[in-house]
From Swiss-Prot:
Belongs to the anion exchanger (TC 2.A.31) family. This is Anion exchange protein 4. Residues 1-41, 915-938 are annotated as: Disordered. Electroneutral Cl(-)/HCO3(-) antiporter that favors chloride ion entry and efflux of hydrogencarbonate and sodium ion across the basolateral membrane and may participate in salivary secretion. Also mediates Cl(-)/HCO3(-) exchange activity in the presence of K(+) as well as Cs(+), Li(+), and Rb(+). Does not contribute to Cl(-)/HCO3(-) exchanger in the apical membrane of the upper villous epithelium. Its main location: membrane. Expressed in submandibular gland (SMG) duct and cortical collecting duct (CCD) of kidney. Lower expressed in duodenal villi. Glycans are attached at residues 546, 569, 920, 931, 948. The chain crosses the membrane at residues 385-405, 413-433, 470-490, 501-521, 593-613, 634-654, 681-701, 727-747, 784-804, 807-827, 870-890. Changing residue 273 to A: Significantly decreases Cl(-)/HCO3(-) antiporter activity. Does not affect plasma membrane localization. Does not affect PKA-mediated Cl(-)/HCO3(-) antiporter activity. It is found in: Basolateral cell membrane.
Length: 952
């Protein structure tokens, strides 16, 4: 059981509210745009007020030539017009002067307030406002003419040409005939149904008394000249007065615009019936204003927008809070079973009490989505995902195929790895409950294969027939687990277990990537100057020119070398020239290219760093948002292409991707079907049940831990999980691969989560200051299916794939492993061990759990991780599956060390522990109560995840 916002461990890691049901166009409302702005799922069900675009027009040029100029605009945040630069400022949190709010309140209390005005045009609106003022007919006419004067808007183009004043300020009439998208790029980023509000402020010499008016239109109308965007206007505010107060009218205009941009004030004023309601809303705003001491803050500084918006829940009236609290609680419980600890299991984990009942329910749930699983893949983003995952899958197949060939002495190899990956993966994508899962060989299963082969060799057993019976028993055991709905045990896989497993395999992944590079350097050694071990000489036939004389000579420097009869330093005579002249190149480095090792390291780290940089550029300030999105989505693909291009340009003989070119088993003399017994005795088919039991535990733990991670509700998957169906498919494929002598396959967490990461949907357009909204994952079956089909035909793509350097693929593997390890919450707690207390970030966890207890919990996890690594690396690796089960047992034992409240924050609660926590528990109570605790805002925000790329 997790707490809201605990998923990323830091209090700031709760993401903005995003609606998964929004269309992928990105034009749907973002955080705070439905209902009172800033309200999320539960609150938006109570009210759906449209987004309000507020524009401040200021009267400038007194006393010479009066004109209205746009000087500010608001959506979520304020944008000021920098007059000198002729451009809009970056969106920032507005700061107000308290006297301006007080003067605004006084002006509105004594001025004109028209609620539900029936005006149908700007002229009618101005007439109603002016008629309410006690002015002479002449002044009334002047005021009316002034208010009808067309303002000058600043429409910033997307070009790089410097703006002159004549271009920066354009008359609205000049753009009336231009297409809307060319008039204002901001218009494209507003959701459908957005409305406008105009605030007019300034000094007017012929006025003797301040003039204030606030108008709410019953039916919004387009007051075209007043705002830069052609939107129906709902509110109109006028603040004018004699030129005696300096910039006070400008600040009052800003105050009015900020009020209208405030969610709670806007919600209240939309429902106000009389002037007291309007003033009460303003007073409520004043009660929540935070003042900054003048001597501790630069008033000209602009506060950047927060990364994540706080919830507006507790700012609304008590009755609305009660309704939204219930609605929010219901939505929150549905949002993430891990975050909010539901008291009833999710549908996929409800016990039916019938044989294969869970499997039947999974099939029924997934059948209705089957057609859309293919139609939803018709999107350009899926092409990037296919290319990225295909290269990762092919590299993984080659890597594990080579390792498996070494471990089994050629009984299985790269060809079996390709064939098994293609057939098993494609079948799984077609029939699985979670088609986003990518099947692959995994490290723990490879360890078991190595041990099984060693056992067969030591006892002179026929390996493949023995392995066949192990696979048959594993299939039987897994089918029994499916029949008895054993997948319900995943409720006991808390974050403690998941992090231990993911951290272990992440380290294995990083270790293997680095190990492969070290092996490559050994194969292509670095030639250090002056090293006799890497010499290369040209030997000529004749007297004294023989090998014994060369090897026995005491060569201490270049002169000694050149004085040996018949020998010439190869630095002066390359091996090809030596051969042409009748000599013979002699020495260990005659056929070694000295640049291979260093250049391979360059490709390795270039692809690794490029993938990280391009992934992070998606959330940077560089380039337009469309370019950033493309670079982020294609980060790994671009890193691979960059490495290939660099390798091709320099033309060095780096090791390339090797793909089998012949379709036949690696072990000569055997057919594709494995004989049931071979040379083994019959009773071995029964004895195989014992290792099969251990392998079944490993398969179950590996598959279901991956499934739990993949199906976390914060990923906003809409089509549900299929724990029972996935395990059933893996069990059937175990029988198939065992019969053909192919590798065993299970869910590969690293590639599966990389698959999800490549398919994440975000809003395409965001209003200024708003981060892109996480909309969910593009759930479909086609990308995985195409990946595995391409893997199967890769034998015929060898002429193309042979140009991909292996160091580049090792760099991508390192990237996935590092990204996985850095995203695990456990690693962030390990970092606390190295931080002085005063430098530790402000985390919710540290507010509720003593630091010593946090360190103790982290130390226990480190000890478990070290134990798993030792067991994996020793002959005792046969008990590795039991050690994974041991993680669950250790987590259960932690109940004797930590209190339920501490475990609630440090980890998740097991089903039995949830019953020990009362409904009115003190810590999580503020999640739904709407109280005023300092944590409630931070804990209240739902999580839109940065996909955690774990490992396989």
């Amino acid at each position: 059981m997790k707490l809201p916002g605990q998923g990323d461990f830091e209090s700031s890691d709760a993401h903005e509210n995003a609606h998964s049901e929004e269309p992928d166009s990105g034009l749907g409302p973002g955080p705070g745009l439905n209902g009172p702005s800033g309200i999320d799922i539960g609150e938006s069900q109570v009210s759906k007020d449209p987004l309000l675009f507020i524009q401040l027009n200021e009267l400038l040029g007194w006393p010479q030539a009066l004109e209205w100029r746009e000087t500010g605009r608001w959506l979520l945040f304020e944008e000021k017009l920098d007059m000198g630069a002729g451009r809009w400022s970056a969106p920032h949190v507005p700061t107000l002067e308290l006297p301006s709010l007080q003067k605004l309140r006084s002006l509105l209390a004594e001025g004109i307030v028209l609620l539900d005005c029936q005006a149908q045009s700007l002229l009618e609106l101005v007439e109603q406002v002016v008629s309410g003022e006690s002015l002479s007919p002449e002044l009334r006419g002047q005021l009316q003419a002034l208010l009808l004067q067309r303002p000058q808007h600043h429409i910033q183009t997307m070009g790089i040409r410097p703006c002159r004043e004549s271009n920066a300020f354009r008359k609205a009439s000049r753009d009336e005939d231009a297409p809307l998208k060319h008039q204002n790029p901001l218009r494209q980023k507003l959701p459908a149904g957005a409305e406008a509000a105009a605030v007019l402020a300034g000094e007017l010499g012929f006025l003797e008394q301040p003039l204030g008016a606030f108008v709410r239109l019953r039916n919004p109308i387009v007051l075209e000249p007043l705002t830069e965007m052609i939107l129906p206007s709902r509110f109109f505010c006028l603040l004018l007065g004699p030129p005696t107060l300096g910039r006070s009218y400008h600040e009052m205009g800003r105050a009015a615009a900020v009020l209208l941009s405030d969610p709670q004030f806007q919600w209240s004023v939309r429902r106000a019936s009389h002037l007291p309601d309007l003033l009460a809303a303003l007073d409520a705003f004043l009660q929540e204003v935070t003042a900054l001491p003048p001597g501790r803050w630069d008033r000209t500084a602009r506060i950047p927008p927060p990364k994540y918006l706080p919830s507006q829940h507790k700012r609304f009236p008590s009755k609305l809070q009660e309704v939204t609290s219930l609605s929010r609680q219901s939505a929150a419980l549905a949002e993430d079973k891990h975050h909010h600890g539901p008291h009833t299991p999710i549908p996929e984990l409800q016990r039916t009490g019938r044989l294969f009942g869970g499997l039947i329910q999974d099939v029924r749930r997934k059948a209705c989505w089957y057609t859309s699983d293919f139609l939803d893949a018709l999107h350009p983003q899926c092409f990037s995902a296919v290319f990225y995952i295909y290269l990762a899958t092919v590299t993984n197949a080659i890597t594990f195929g080579g390792l498996l060939g070494d471990a089994t002495e050629g009984a299985q190899g790269v060809l079996e790895s390709f064939l098994g990956t293609a057939v098993a993966g494609a079948a799984f994508c077609l029939m699985a409950g979670q088609p986003l899962t990518i099947l692959s060989s995994t490290g723990p299963v490879l360890v078991f294969e190595r041990l099984l082969f060693s056992f067969s060799r030591d006892y002179s057993l026929d390996y493949l027939p023995f392995r066949l019976w192990v696979g048959i028993w594993v299939t039987a055991f897994c089918l029994a687990l499916v029949a008895t709905e054993a997948s319900l045990l995943v409720r006991y896989f808390t974050r403690f277990t998941e992090e231990g497993f993911c951290a272990l395999i992440s380290l294995i992944f990083i270790y293997d990537a680095m190990g492969k590079m070290l092996n490559l350097i050994r194969a292509y050694p670095i030639q250090r100057p002056g090293s006799s071990a890497y010499g290369c000489f040209c030997q000529y036939p004749g007297t004294g020119g023989n090998t014994s004389e060369w090897t026995s000579a005491k060569l201490k420097d270049t002169e000694d070398i050149l004085s040996v009869p018949g020998l010439v330093n190869a630095s002066f005579l390359p091996p090809p020239e030596c051969i042409r002249q009748g000599g013979h190149p002699l020495g260990p480095s005659c056929h070694t290219v000295p640049d291979i090792a260093f250049f391979s390291l360059l490709l390795f780290f270039t692809s690794f760093l490029c993938a990280i940089a391009l992934k992070h550029i998606k959330n940077s300030r560089f380039f337009p948002s469309v370019v950033r999105k493309v670079l982020g989505d294609f980060s790994s693909v671009l890193a691979i292409l960059l490495g290939c291009g660099l390798d091709t340009f320099l033309g060095l003989a780096t090791p390339k991707l090797l793909v089998p070119t012949e379709f036949k088993p690696t072990l000569s003399g055997r057919g594709w079907l494995v004989s049931p017994f071979g040379a083994n005795p019959w009773w071995l088919s029964v004895a195989a049940a014992l290792p099969a039991l251990l392998l079944s535990i490993l398969i179950f733990m590996d598959q279901q831990i991956t499934a739990v991670i993949l199906n976390r509700a914060e990923y906003r998957l809409q089509k549900g999980a299929g724990f029972h169906l996935d395990l059933f498919c893996v069990a059937v494929l175990m029988l198939f691969t065992s019969a053909l002598g192919l590798p065993w396959y299970v869910s590969a967490t690293v590639i599966s989560l990389a698959h999800i990461d490549s398919l994440r949907r975000e809003s395409k357009a965001c209003i200024p200051g708003e981060a892109p909204n996480f909309l969910g994952i593009r759930e479909q079956r086609l990308t995985g299916l195409v990946v595995f089909v391409l893997t199967g035909v890769s034998i015929f793509l060898a002429p193309v794939l042979k140009f991909i350097p292996m160091p580049v693929l090792y760099g991508i593997f390192l990237y996935m492993g590092v990204a996985a390890l850095s995203s695990i919450q456990f690693v962030k707690r390990v970092q606390l061990l190295l931080m002085p207390r005063k430098h530790q970030p402000d985390m919710l966890l540290l507010r509720h759990v003593p630091l010593s207890r946090v360190h103790l919990f982290t130390a226990i996890q480190l000890a478990c991780l070290g134990l798993l690594w030792v067991v994996k690396s020793t002959p005792a690796a046969i008990v590795f599956p039991l050690m994974l089960l041991g993680l669950v047992a250790i987590r259960k034992a932690l109940e004797w060390v930590f209190s339920p409240q501490e475990l609630l924050w440090l980890d998740e609660l097991m089903p039995e522990e949830e019953e020990t926590i009362p409904e009115n528990r003190s810590e999580p109570e503020h999640l739904f109560s709407g109280n005023d605790s300092e944590d409630s805002e931070l804990m209240y925000q739902p999580k839109a995840p940065e996909i955690n790329i774990s490992v396989n």
